[in-house]
């Protein structure tokens, strides 16, 4: 056998014998599929969509259940405990009197993209009284029990007492 044929045969055998190890080594370096994120329980207040949040707030407030209505507001637990019900009642009154907008919020958990509004926010309209004006905005936040939920934004709530 010629030297050239021996070299070709040796090269072919080397490739055939080493290929399984090279493939196994390469596969071991590929990223492994991530385990699915743990499922969170559905939010009992239906705050998973902008639609569920605003109509849940209005339903609770209209029935006079301001403790539940306060759960739709972006505020600390301590502030919710001391001021939540009063602020929910005031917000409902302001919305009844001073809201201007098209109350057709998104039914999608991610909301609907709006020009000039960050992706984690939804602008529903404006409330105005005299020279004071405030956007009615929702913000998407993380909740330890329910995952991502929508709340009436703290930016909106800070303006409510002035309206």
Language model region names:
Residues 7-8, 18, 30-33:
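Positively charged, low-complexity intrinsically disordered regions
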Residues 1-6:
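N-terminal secretory signal peptides that target proteins for export/translocation
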Residues 10-22:
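Bacterial N-terminal signal peptides
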């Amino acid at each position: 056998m010629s030297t050239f044929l021996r070299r070709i045969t040796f090269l072919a055998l080397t490739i055939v014998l080493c290929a399984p190890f090279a493939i196994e080594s390469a596969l071991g370096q590929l990223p492994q599929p991530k385990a699915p994120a743990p499922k969170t329980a559905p939010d009992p207040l239906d705050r998973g969509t902008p639609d569920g949040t605003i109509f849940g707030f209005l339903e609770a407030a209209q029935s006079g259940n301001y403790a539940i209505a306060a759960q739709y507001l972006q505020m600390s637990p301590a502030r919710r405990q001391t001021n939540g019900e009063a602020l929910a009642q005031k917000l409902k009154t302001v919305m009844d009197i001073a809201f201007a907008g098209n109350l057709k919020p998104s039914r999608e958990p991610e909301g609907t993209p709006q020009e000039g509004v960050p992706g984690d926010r939804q602008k529903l309209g404006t409330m105005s009284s005299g020279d004071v004006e405030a956007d009615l905005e929702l913000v998407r936040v993380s909740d330890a029990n329910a995952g991502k939920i929508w709340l009436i934004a703290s930016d909106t709530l800070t303006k409510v007492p002035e309206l």
